[in-house]
């Protein structure tokens, strides 16, 4: 049976097919008669519950012009589900239906091609076949009848293009036009009804082979609007060779016969938390292949505010210049989501290299995002340089001078908000210093200048201080009273105990002499003249700027582009040998959580997995690199013996321990690949028992305290949990409620090991916990007890791993003319005759006290492979040096036998101290090499 005959058979309702071969004119006349029959076509097309046989006024549909026709041959891109209206308003009688000789268009699809184009039946049939061939459509073999039953609401019968081939009925109009012409009230809104909505066309009501309503056969997600629905279905790229093509979800909507599409990210709902309907898009779908070519979305002004801002956040390729931020009120929640997106570097809003320019754009929405972005950084107890390193390690701080000036202004405000008691600081002064530090970093490390052309320390201090004074005058507009009040408040903050214990203040005036510091503390007790205030202000900033210059000279302020290899695509082995492919991806270094597979034998692997952040390098003193709160010890009593390194007090990592930041809450997706402390955010924390050991002696009465230990890269912090009125949950600890840290130290050049050994380990009877010791570079020993032997070993591995990753190769000392007792045995005395050599043995020898080389407390920037190679090479040199030193012992005793006892004793002590130092370095190096090889092998084999 032919398709035309089948359609005629269905229309007439005959029991047998008809072989009627009449002309098109007779068929048209027959269609006119059938539309006036007792059961019109619309009643057969739509559910019977939509119509009632009651008189009503003439429907507005009769005013539709006949010229309102739709374009033929457009491939329908989706199914549109129509919400029915109230029966009292949606009911239509038979007399209300218009009768026209033109063909009827339903849901935007042309019902007849012959009436609009003047073609014959045969040409029309060929046209339909061509359309189905071009768009991959298949003919419908059967039509599902939809008869209402009491138990199930009736559904509209399925339709296809072949169904309307021979049914010319009236003028062209769409089903969307039908419903839009009806009066709509709140009670008619299907979304606000408590009762089920009118029957909808579902997937079950359409034949499986009816391909003209579907882009793919996969499950779709529906988003309901006011008068229609939008369905999102995953569409795969037709270009299989393009590996970078994204798997997008294309939303199709048919409105007034025009098929339009949206490009949205499949992971993010275009509505967010809102049910606001999505209105028309200005991107027309001309061809199915245009899905892959869509790169931006134009959001019209009529779109609701929530939808516009949510789309601006969820669409990765959105053209932000086309979104008018002035036409709607900024949504605070949307701006905060955008700020977190930029902070995480996911590039949904803007690429990382253009983030700063986008943030400082003069639009309300961008300003709101910048405000929330800056608030994500916690600069409390950090100095200006350290805070600048923190933000530069996460954001590409580059661009035009005007853009940098605007951004640094927001940075200065945030720094002053988080450090309200900063010494001699206000937003204008912080802004001037931050800008000068960026210029200094460019001059010393980035600009191609000779050594003589680079800025000297005196030039930097003078120029920056001149800028600080100008900023101070601009802040108070020459008002001397306000300026003096500002000075006095800074002095009072400095003199108070709370401010003296601040790491930021200690780090800024570490170079102040004790006399000046004592003088400043007494200034608030007597009346101060303006001259004295300005002198103190000048002395303070001169010293602070010198520290900052030296810190930047030793370690430059790094940008995120130094960590491009940390977001390595391990599934693409071509990128390992193609640096340009990695360099083109401007991503942040904290995307290590996306790692799924680890290649073997590549140095890029070690860099991407465990390279420590060097964005927070600062210059620290080597002595006593441990800070202990002098106001109280672990038992809450006053601790008279202060152990402090001012620069170590100011040290923090590039990820502050703020509980509201997303980086702190981290769930590793692949726990079998690496240890928890091995990946971002590189934090290990837990509750331990703690006992301090000083001068190699413990107290006679062992007193243990419960502490919260936090290890973040090379910074180890202890918080006392034995304070009164402190209730905590071991499973959910909030650091902000614990209080100030009692100990904060760097673990560079430190060593963690069980105490005293595996066979002599002492186990607490109550908790069955194992002891372990931590020896720092300042010779301070900290003893801990873990909850279990397994937990104790985990802490030992974590401490030794980050000590190995952060420590640089130590120095052994060079050739010197200082005699420590074995200078006569090392050949340092020139070629001499035997008589002269025998004579010198009887000379009086001046032996100096031997001291080891200071520990380099600047973290290492080498990758895991480079660090391991450096340690292996140094191990060979250290063994050779140790063997030579051991061989000097007997010869040294013979040479010093004729010397006084004091000289002999000091020489022997010096030899022993150096021997112990070499032995300690050998043990530490063996542990470092072992732990690095362990985790490198674990990463390669996983």
Curated annotation (Swiss-Prot):
Protein name as annotated: PH and SEC7 domain-containing protein C11E3.11c
Pfam families: PH_9 (PF15410), Sec7 (PF01369)
Region of interest called Disordered, as start-end residue ranges on this chain: 1-128, 259-308
Start-end of Polar residues biased regions: 1-18, 50-60, 90-125, 271-284, 292-305
Listed GO MF terms: guanyl-nucleotide exchange factor activity; phosphatidylinositol-3,4,5-trisphosphate binding
Cystine connections: none
Origin superkingdom: Eukaryota
Gene Ontology CC, one term: cell division site
Bias (Low complexity) ranges: 24-40
GO biological process, one term: intracellular protein transport
Domain PH: 681-804
Domain SEC7: 295-497
InterPro entries registered for this protein in UniProt: PH-like_dom_sf, PH_9, PH_domain, Sec7_C_sf, Sec7_dom, Sec7_dom_sf
